[in-house]
């Protein structure tokens, strides 16, 4: 019995030894196997090291950076460490560069740290005051900037809510008067570009729809204005070349009959003053002729001398003879003509003085109401000359003053020899209009 029992114990011992040996062999083999990688336990994803232990802290995996919490669980969402704020995706990957999180844009450095303050986006400045990409108006260090919906700082002309601003190279809106290129603009204290009329210290200014300040002659709302180099609209009397203008308090050029200091002045539709002289409009006291000799003893006002000489020269070159019958007359000379004509009618028609004077006034103007006293009217006699001048006088700044068609308006019978100087711009306009001077100046 002892022998049998001993054999059984021996066999059992051998099996135990073999089992222990196999287990030891297995343990030695397992210690050499890399058990690192992703694993899941209880529905929770974690990462284990070589020995299958959960890792903690920073770890780079396949070129991506992670931070593992206790238990090897990767951090997700926002994480602040040592004053540095980072963001990890739902897969635990640390984000870098520009990222949109919860509908807001952030920028993270290469170390994952959230960036703040001034940064560059596609080479254009942007601003992240608290890490979030700023848009719209922002005040930074006491200065205003505007960032588009894409977060990029705007420069140049920019439409913001229907208003136009100009943001300089530094992104700040211009205010007040400013030159941009060769053009002048005006911006409000808030930076809004001004258009239309603006009252300034030196007068009225006008800015077009594109914001540029106008200068020189402009037609605005059917009225003419003149703006100086500084943009201020002219007011009062203004002379340019041979023409004189008068600008009203609103800056517009006077047109038609206009009362100025108790006297009526007449202006063309373009604002040039033309002195209207007829039986109802004597030569104004302020007018002074500047007579110069033109042919023999005849004289004309200096203002029409050169165009008159050119007109007569061209008439002669056309092979047409003419007689220069009359130019400038003094008040006394006009008085003498009227007196002489009255006496002639008294003798020729056996009339009393009143009857003869009335008859004389049909062809002779009352002293002070003759255009000849201005020195701007000439009488050129000759049928061919009258025909040529009637066709070409407009080109030299003269008008055929009295025609048969307009006799009821002018009060003077047809005088094909009488030409009045008004300047070429006016004469050509009148030719196209077909109006006599009274009609053209709105005096009827």
Q: Where do the model's predicted regions map?
A:
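Extracellular adhesion/carbohydrate-binding repeat motifs centered on closely spaced tryptophans
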Residues: 5-273, 306, 391
